[in-house]
Amino acid sequence: MAADLPEATVQNILDQESLKWVFVGGKGGVGKTTCSSILAICLASVRSSVLIISTDPAHNLSDAFQQRFTKSPTLVQGFSNLFAMEVDPTVETDDMAGTDGMDGLFSDLANAIPGIDEAMSFAEMLKLVQTMDYATIVFDTAPTGHTLRLLQFPATLEKGLSKLMSLKSRFGGLMTQMSRMFGMEDEFGEDALLGRLEGLKDVIEQVNRQFKDPDMTTFVCVCIPEFLSLYETERLVQELAKFEIDTHNIIINQVLYDDEDVESKLLRARMRMQQKYLDQFYMLYDDFNITKLPLLPEEVTGVEALKAFSHKFLTPYHPTTSRSNVEELERKVHTLRLQLKTAEEELERVKSG
């Protein structure tokens, strides 16, 4: 079934010039970082500037490009308009807390609201990014569960803001009095955390609007043709719909293509299994752009390897057709050699006459 359907590419993403935010996510171990890196490379060929951000604590982006990245945008070697950065999705509590006896109180307040630390960290990062002039920003996200929490950050921060407003109205100047007791009035007051959240409010509202705008934001799901990955992809697509975040591209990675030369029973069995799930992907997501990528015998690391693999994102991969073309050319060469040999023998007979 899947083999009969036309192959899609990620060209539609490159053609959508209004896109500002591109998220790449999926189950762990499916090749998200490789796909997000190559997608950023493809976008850099048609955009004035591209920034790729890793929000995965594992930070595989440096490994993919074989270049050290930090929490500040760094120019990727070999490019003039592609930048990369790796950020910690959890807030640095040392930056948030006071000193001496107050840091425990501050931490308790921050931790009292589930997810507030990650949400504030992500909002601060977006606030920084928005001050920079990048045409498109690609997110290499953590596995599905972390990604969904990340996408909830606007609601989490709004909830945190309302809770702290409620605390302020109920307890008045209690926190200010406590800060005076510790001699920290200048460093910590009742409005410290509240002020920080309010400072992010405009960013939250603006980004939330942009994330829900299909002209500005899209989510690319990366998966492999196996049951658990199919399940995670469906869960992700359903959750994205709840968040009103556009998604219309799926990349199916590590596909084994049918090859007449394959004799291994194990590979044949894996091909049959993959084909079953490929059919299900095409049935479930018949209105999506589905890009299939082959399983390679080696890892794709380093700029040159990423660039070499990038053409498979824009041109459907057809190994059978390629093999047939090569075999046809080889047959033609063999025939011409035979004809040349026959002609040379005929020429020798004529000469010896």
Curated annotation (Swiss-Prot):
EC number(s) recorded for this UniProt protein? 3.6.-.-
- The regions listed as transmembrane in this protein's record are none
Pfam families named in the record: ArsA_ATPase
Task: Family membership, please give it.
Answer: Belongs to the arsA ATPase family.
Q: What's the name of the protein?
A: ATPase GET3A
The alphabetical list of record keywords is: ATP-binding, Coiled coil, Cytoplasm, Endoplasmic reticulum, Hydrolase, Nucleotide-binding, Transport
Which locations, inside or outside the cell, does it occupy?
Cytoplasm, Cytosol; Cytoplasm; Endoplasmic reticulum
Q: Name one GO biological process term.
A: protein insertion into ER membrane
Record carries keyword Methyltransferase: no
* Listed GO MF terms: ATP binding; ATP hydrolysis activity
Q: Which residues form a coiled coil?
A: 320-353
What function does the entry list? ATPase required for the post-translational delivery of tail-anchored (TA) proteins to the endoplasmic reticulum. Recognizes and selectively binds the transmembrane domain of TA proteins in the cytosol. This complex then targets to the endoplasmic reticulum by membrane-bound receptors, where the tail-anchored protein is released for insertion. This process is regulated by ATP binding and hydrolysis. ATP binding drives the homodimer towards the closed dimer state, facilitating recognition of newly synthesized TA membrane proteins. ATP hydrolysis is required for insertion.
Description of the deletion phenotype: Strong reduction of root hair length.
Catalytic site positions: D56
Q: What class of enzyme is it?
A: hydrolase
Per UniProt, ATP binds at: K27, G28, G29, V30, G31, K32, T33, T34, E226, N253
Q: Which GO terms describe its cellular component?
A: cytosol; extracellular region; GET complex
Recorded catalytic reaction(s): these are:
ATP + H2O = ADP + phosphate + H(+)
The subunit field of the Swiss-Prot or TrEMBL record says: Homodimer. Interacts with GET1 and GET4.
